Amino acid sequence: MGSYQSEKRYYLHIQLLDIVPPIWRRIVVPGAISLHTLHKMFQVTMGWENAHLYLFRLTINEKTTVYGLPDPDWDDAGLRIRDSRRTKLDATVWAEWLKLTYEYDLGDSWMHQITVERIEHVADESVYEDALWITPRCLAGERACPPEDAGGVGGYTLLLEALQNPRHPEHEQMRQWAGMSYDSELFSVQQVNSALANLD
């Protein structure tokens, strides 16, 4: 991932909704990035594989604006999607109280709540030389995200039931489908930051 000169850095909390125990991450990113770049960072941070469409939704005073990748061949159901590649994070989410939702895989509809925990302003341009100010990184998190195409929250719940019960009639089948090494409790900050450092 390239370096970013930014007057702000954002501390974000990302949580996958409707799953208990929660699957969440805390990351810090430069404010100057586009929402599309933020999407790519979320993919790496959460553990998704960037195999499906996505949408950001920002609601202010009961008005919702939707961001994503406009596609003339896709029926957007009148959402009037704004191009996330041309939309900067710091120009869109300009206050800490704003909440953003991120939907990944419009079929499975994985909904993530994005909370801005803190926005820090760069006081001295010399800090641009400090990679901590301009390099996205993960600070903390818990649990692995579901496998791709698990069927949304309902399908994921059934998958865990099968994986956690060796006597379940679909235990072996689900182990093979999810990957023999899949562990729903596994999460590594170090692995995420290594992947972020190599993100194109």
List each model region and its residues.
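Short linear regulatory motifs enriched in tryptophan with gly/pro/ser
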Residues: M1-D200
